[in-house]
Amino acid sequence: MLVSSSYVLAQSNNNLCVGHYYSEEEAKNVLAELKHQYNTKEEWKQRAELIRNGILKGADLVPFPKKTPLKPIYTKKRSYDGYTVQNVAIESLPGVFVTGSLYLPENTNVKMPGILSTHGHWSDPEEYGRFREDAQMRNAGLAKMGAAVFAYDMVGYGEMQELGWKHKHPLAFKQQLWNSIRALDFLLSIENVDPERIGITGASGGGTQAFMLAAVDERIKVSVPVVQVSAHFFGGCVCESGMPVHKSENHQTNNVEIAALAAPRPMLLVSDGDDWTKNTPNVEFPHIQYIYKLMDAEKNVENAHLPNDKHGYEFSKRKEVYPFLAKHLMLDLSAILNSDGRISEKEIVVEPMRKLKVFSNENPIPDYAVKSNDEVNW
């Protein structure tokens, strides 16, 4: 049977925590109650294991699917000032093609960090994910600083959407988390990528992908979820909260605790004053900071709050992210500084969508490609 029983589970489960699940006041009270459950490092580690297992079980990823060959397909490399771009497709499962773009620094003959670049939800196909100007800017900027950056399409977006995949599918969370795990496998397979310097960053729904992967996969050493970690908002899309990953018969959690599973690994929360992260400095961040303190790593977590900003990953936010990743992944921040010593993305080329595609008439997708969510053989 191609569609597992989790399809039914995801549609009917009473344990789903969706969207604005709590009021802002309720969320504060919940965090206060949770805080009393862990007063020592060992108590938090026990709680963390319960939450981590809850994510994997709720996503129907226990046991893990067998990891099959990624079989990457590459397009021709394009060279720019200080970095290159090459489109890539990998198989997260046999025939399930995850499409993306690989940004590499000019010099790949030395050990380099690896960064996964995730994206959120947009309505205009030409502004989808990795095709967006803000995504291309950060991907190229980080590559210029010395990182290998893999930006990939989320389920039902970009080239996956063109194949016939749907984003609003009951098992989108499962597929998306698995795709991220395999994207990380691919990143680590690249020659000279340092497994001890692996990061992930993304905004909105991409922020959810960032903290979820960091929560379940300790190969992520540094995480930067942007405009998404909230005590009262659990994500409004099935790819974030459409499976019972926050609640089970023996536990209930939220995205604040899930983000804190990254402790003691470095994490930067980026928040703004115009969405569900507006309370971060006073609500979410202190709780996460408390957990990092229990883990003897209080200095490893930071919050960049931009009260006048709106939801997105614009330059003002990237200016906060570049130094943090440079510090913790040992990147060369000077590579994106202008003559005045300020961060500048002026030399970065924003490519048209057609250049960022893996498959075309000249490079057709293999005949055995899985072209819809319901055809996946787990």
Regions found by a protein language model. Give the residues of each.
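Glycine-rich nucleophile elbow surrounding the catalytic serine of serine-hydrolase chemistry
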Residues: G202-A214
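Mobile cap/lid helix-loop segments that gate and shape the active-site cleft of serine hydrolases
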Residues: I220-A260, R265, D272-F285, L294-A297
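Alpha/beta-hydrolase-fold serine-hydrolase catalytic core, especially in secreted/extracellular enzymes
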Residues: V8-F97, V270-W378
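Glycine-rich active-site/cofactor-binding loop and its immediate structural neighborhood
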Residues: K76-R132
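Loop/turn elements at helix/coil->beta-strand transitions in domains of secreted/extracellular proteins
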Residues: K111-P113, M145-A148, D194-R197, E218-V222, ...
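Alpha/beta-hydrolase fold nucleophile elbow
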Residues: N192-S204
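Cap/lid segment of the alpha/beta-hydrolase catalytic domain
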Residues: N109-N192, V229-C239, P244
